[in-house]
Amino acid sequence: MRALLRAVICAGCAAGAVVAAQSGQDGPHWAYGYMKPPAPGESGPPCPPAARPFPDCAYPVTPTADDGIKRTLPGTTRSFTRNEAYFDYGPADWYPEDHPAMPDIVARGRQADGVRACALCHYPNGQGKMENGGVAGLPAAYIQQQLADFKSGARRSADPRKANTNEMAAIARKLTDAEATAAADYFASMPWRKWVRVVESDSAPRVRATSNGLFLPVAGAPAEPIGQRIIEMPERPESTEMMRDPRSGFVAYVPIGSIAKGEALVTTGGDGRTVRCTTCHGADLNGTATIPGIAGRSASYIVRQLYDMQQGTRQTKTMKAAVAKLTVEDMVNITAYVASRPVESPLDTRPR
């Protein structure tokens, strides 16, 4: 009987651990690209002020052997090997017609100082991926302020393992004023284009995380309960992970009912639980000349920022009251609604 009781207790503990992981009650580690919460004392690589952004502030990984195969993507005549596509100081530009001429700091970075090209992570078109930030269409002054906050330590990650946040801080310290201005003006000049498809579901594909925090589906694995999480992954995993496809976006699986719950919080404030997002970000959440748009952007990124602001690792006076009372479930709901909204950019002149 005692053995049976111990087995029942252990099974209950295991089930509780799964529920805790899926509820995000230890913090939304899934939004940071991790499969479980950080262990006590666990952190990313040391990144002191004098460090070179790369490789000192990045996780050490075994270089991928280049198979020499030239690959291509739909709608372009260009071809690159995987390592050419990922070259830190001149990554592949698949669609140069999609953006203005890139400043040198965006296209190539500064190799002597370990400053990788902005286009490596954020793409030449500024759309970025779930593990970093989409920067296209943000106000130039806002981008400049974020670089200043990274530099001063006012913007850090609430998950201490997130190495690319530390690398951004190191890059910000290395940038000249002219480089920071050029990068900000460049990304601000391009429209943000809707990048994520939001799907309400009670389950999500099982995923694995890359060293940089990109979620990829586990081939052949059954779906798993979504709990109170958002699981975001590339629409075309191989194109994104292998070739950095800047035209292929993401799909975000969110809990059933979360979009409607999020709409109530975003548009009314939820009876004092938060502040109406539309007050500052605009009725359509597409921002203003000075305030960033949040509609249709990466779900993982939005959750990270809400949680970072609440935990005080991203310091911002304007958002302090808005995030103070939010639970992780609230953040999931808000994000589900915000990420699902249409994008209307005054810079986007494409026919509709």
Ranges and model annotations:
Residues M1-L5:
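N-terminal secretory signal peptides that target proteins for export/translocation
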Residues R6-A17:
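Bacterial N-terminal signal peptides
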Residues Q22-R116, R155-R276, Q311-R352:
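Flexible coil segments in periplasmic/lumen-exposed cytochrome c-class electron-transfer proteins
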Residues V115, P124-M130, N286, Q315-T316:
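Extracellular-facing binding/remodeling surfaces
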Residues L120-Q127, K151-S152, A188-W192, E235, ...:
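Detector for the c-type heme attachment site
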Residues K129-V135, A289-A295:
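Short cysteine/histidine-rich zinc-coordinating motifs and their immediately flanking basic loops
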Residues A136-T165, V196-V198, A295-T316:
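Extended intrinsically disordered, low-complexity coil regions enriched in Ser, Thr, Gly, Ala
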Residues G269, R276, D284-T290, S298, ...:
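Intrinsically disordered, low-complexity segments enriched in Gly and acidic/Ser/Thr residues
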